[in-house]
Amino acid sequence: MVRNQILVLDHNYGLWYERRRDDHERVRRRDGDVWGPFYEQPFARSGEGTAWEGLSKYDLNRPNAWYWNRLKQFAEKGAEKGLLLFHENYFQHNILEAGAHWVDCPWRSANNINQTDMPEPVPFAGDKRIFVADMFYDISHPVRREFHRKYIRQCLDNFADDANVVQLISAEFTGPLHFVQFWLDVIGEWEKETGKKATVALSATKDVQDAILNDTQRAKLVDIIDIRYWHYKVDGLYAPEGGKNLAPRQHARKMKVGKVTFDEAYRAVSEYRKKFPEKAVTYYAQNYPDMAWAVFMASGSCPVVPVADEAF
């Protein structure tokens, strides 16, 4: 990262793994014929039963010590070099779009010993797609709600003393407002109990983002506004709604994404910086690498400014 002048690693699990189980081929895997290193997940194996890929089932009550230690080591080494870890707590692609991700996911009922009550057999759409985000984000389910709470707290505990780690809710997140509210409430409870402060980035669709920022209590927990799942375009606004059980790519097929120029990127960052001057704003929306100077000039953070001059 240092050699290539990269400031941020935007990370979602898993880590350092053999990819044949989720390589997006349009076939179902009959068995667990895989090679190590295996797809490391945040949860430890239970030693009981057999998960879909042939190893023992996960225990959602037990963190995977190797996984969390590995990430913490990266954060600590990165801090020495001035690097940031954007820690995506979840990966929405596991529960929307490609079914290969869900079949091995720890939250799937067949893969854990914790009775998560997700549907079996897997409700594939067209024999390959998966749409279980609405169930996954349902915090009224008492069992899954508690496991979500424990997992979010593990994300916070692991990096409690790492100032270069930024917590985000999920990669590719287009989920509902109520789940973001729940996520922030857990963070707030953790901060109150521990006396520590997490650095939190609000990364969501525009309607969800605005609702949180207009919520006085929850907005206090947000340090960074991450513009990623919406953008201004030359002929208006591209802003899919949250909680529609559709991934970013699926929204993009149904709506006109449009063209983004310097003016639109500058407008988005500038508006939120002016409205919320106490918060940083990052911009990773449509065509963001080419919008680096617009982000920079609008007082945005972490722009991909293509400058090789070491004195800059």
Where are the predicted features?
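Active-site mouth of glycoside hydrolases
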Residues: 1-224
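Extracellular glycoside hydrolase catalytic/binding regions
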Residues: 142-150, 159-312
